From Swiss-Prot:
It comes from Escherichia coli O1:K1 / APEC. Keywords: Hydrolase, Magnesium. Its cofactor is Mg(2+). This is Nucleoside triphosphatase NudI. Gene3D superfamilies: Nucleoside Triphosphate Pyrophosphohydrolase (3.90.79.10). It catalyses: a ribonucleoside 5'-triphosphate + H2O = a ribonucleoside 5'-phosphate + diphosphate + H(+); a 2'-deoxyribonucleoside 5'-triphosphate + H2O = a 2'-deoxyribonucleoside 5'-phosphate + diphosphate + H(+); dUTP + H2O = dUMP + diphosphate + H(+); dTTP + H2O = dTMP + diphosphate + H(+). Belongs to the Nudix hydrolase family. NudI subfamily. GO terms for molecular function: dCTP diphosphatase activity; dTTP diphosphatase activity; dUTP diphosphatase activity; magnesium ion binding. InterPro entries: Nucleoside_triphosphatase_NudI, Nudix_hydrolase, NUDIX_hydrolase-like_dom_sf, NUDIX_hydrolase_CS, NUDIX_hydrolase_dom. The gene is nudI. The keyword Metal-binding does not apply. Residues 1-141 form the Nudix hydrolase domain.
């Protein structure tokens, strides 16, 4: 079984948290709301990976003013690829508390939508298991 280390930013701006809705046809959690993030590449430092993933998935304009390592989690997930293939992967999630100076987001093709969500509204979103676990641990659910 392949192992992946995933960096996940829990991004907050003015009391709201950034959630991204995964594309319906790919990823570990198709069609569900999640934190952004992605895999650490060989030879890449963890914070470099976090900043790269944010640029790739959320655009160059989102400005982070704080990045603080917070916690980790792990599980086994089945990833569905755009061509229909599936693969089981052991996922290690490194989760960071982040604060952004703005809400300028430009999502890439991995996502179909995004939202800045106040804690009291999080229960109304179809959150994936990993995101739900993270938000509970943070005391937001």
């Amino acid at each position: 079984m392949r192992q992946r280390t995933i960096v996940c930013p829990l991004i907050q701006n003015d009391g709201a948290y950034l959630l991204c809705k995964m594309a319906d046809d790919r990823g570990v959690f198709p069609g569900q709301w999640a934190l952004s993030g992605g895999g650490v590449e060989p030879g890449e430092r963890i914070e470099e990976a976090l900043r790269r993933e944010i640029r790739e998935e959320l655009g160059e304009q989102l400005l982070l003013t704080e990045i603080t390592p917070w916690t980790f989690s792990d599980d086994i997930r089945t990833k569905t690829y755009a061509d229909g293939r599936k693969e089981e992967i052991y996922m290690i999630y490194l989760i960071f508390d982040c604060v952004s100076a703005n809400r300028e987001v430009k999502i890439n093709e991995e996502f179909q939508d995004y939202a800045w969500v106040k804690p009291e509204d999080l229960v109304h979103y179809d959150l994936n298991v990993a995101t739900r676990k993270t938000l509970r641990l943070k005391g937001l659910l």
